[in-house]
Amino acid sequence: MNWRSEHIWIELLKGSRKRGNFFWACILFLGSLGFLAVGASSYLGKNMISVLPSQQILFFPQGVVMSFYGIAGLFISSYLWCTILWNVGSGYDRFDRKEGIVCIFRWGFPGIKRRIFLQFLVRDIQSIRIQVKEGLYPRRILYMEIRGQGVIPLTRTDEKFFTPREIEQKAAELAYFLRVPIEVF
C-alpha cells in the first residue's frame, strides 16, 4: 500500500504475515504432529492413528527417526509462527522532500534491536539502483545508495513477483520523486 502527496511518499511493507507463510506454518505443524504421533505409536505399541497401522513400525530405528522428524518439524513450525506473530520484516519507507528526510522502519525479532529505524537526508542519496538477475531463480531488487553508508534494499530480497516492467516503473517513480539518477547492475 502506498500513500503519496506532492512532498511525502509513504510505502507500507507487509512483512511475514503473508498467505504463503500461514500455509507453510500450518502444513509443517500438522505434518510434524503426524510424524510425532507415528513415533509415539510405535513406542507405545498402540495404534494412535486410525488411518495408518503404526504397530507394524518398529520403534528402533523407524520410530526414533519419525519422532526426531516430528520434534524438528515442531521447532521449525514454532519459528514460523513466531515470525508471523511478531510480523518480522513489516514496516514502512517514508520519503519526505519538504523536510529533506528519508525514514526506513522495520520490525525485527524481539530483543534490543527489535525496532530498526534508519534516517537519512535526501541530499545524501546518490542513486536508486536496480539489481536484476535472470535465470532459474530470477531476482529483481530495488536499492537506495546512500553516500557513506552503502546500499540499502527497499524491496524484499525474496520478493520474486515483480516483473521487469514493475520494478523499472517503481524505480523510475522513486528516482523522479527524489530527483536522483537510476543505476542498473
Curated annotation (Swiss-Prot):
This is Photosystem I assembly protein Ycf4. InterPro entries: PSI_Ycf4_assembly. GO terms for biological process: photosynthesis. It is found in: Plastid, Chloroplast thylakoid membrane. Seems to be required for the assembly of the photosystem I complex. Its main location: plastid. It comes from Zea mays (Maize). It comes from the Eukaryota. The lineage of its organism: Eukaryota, Viridiplantae, Streptophyta, Embryophyta, Tracheophyta.
